[in-house]
């Protein structure tokens, strides 16, 4: 039997990959989304969840950046 899944290859640094693995393990998106963990900088994920992943990564980046205040 063959299972076909539509996926997207993501290339990222190891720190971002750890964040993606954390989201996958904690079922933050409601289900597992990583199809295959390929190497230290590549993962293959479900195509249907790419937009939501981009939002979550954007939220993480916003939390890690500081706004520039005007004096």
Curated annotation (Swiss-Prot):
Query: InterPro entries recorded for this chain?
Result: TFB5-like_sf, TFIIH_TTDA/Tfb5
Keywords in UniProt for this one? Cytoplasm, DNA damage, DNA repair, Nucleus, Transcription, Transcription regulation
Listed as disulfide-bonded, the cysteine pairs are none
Q: Which GO terms describe its biological process?
A: nucleotide-excision repair, preincision complex assembly; transcription by RNA polymerase II; transcription initiation at RNA polymerase II promoter
Q: Where in the cell is it found?
A: Nucleus; Cytoplasm
Q: What Pfam families does the record point to?
A: Tfb5 (PF06331)
> Which GO cellular component does the record give, naming just one?
nucleoplasm
Q: What does this protein do?
A: Component of the general transcription and DNA repair factor IIH (TFIIH) core complex, which is involved in general and transcription-coupled nucleotide excision repair (NER) of damaged DNA and, when complexed to CAK, in RNA transcription by RNA polymerase II. In NER, TFIIH acts by opening DNA around the lesion to allow the excision of the damaged oligonucleotide and its replacement by a new DNA fragment. In transcription, TFIIH has an essential role in transcription initiation.
Please describe the quaternary structure of this protein.
Component of the 7-subunit TFIIH core complex composed of XPB/ERCC3, XPD/ERCC2, GTF2H1, GTF2H2, GTF2H3, GTF2H4 and GTF2H5, which is active in NER. The core complex associates with the 3-subunit CDK-activating kinase (CAK) module composed of CCNH/cyclin H, CDK7 and MNAT1 to form the 10-subunit holoenzyme (holo-TFIIH) active in transcription.
Report the family membership.
Belongs to the TFB5 family.
Name listed for the protein in its UniProt record: General transcription factor IIH subunit 5
Q: Which gene encodes it?
A: GTF2H5
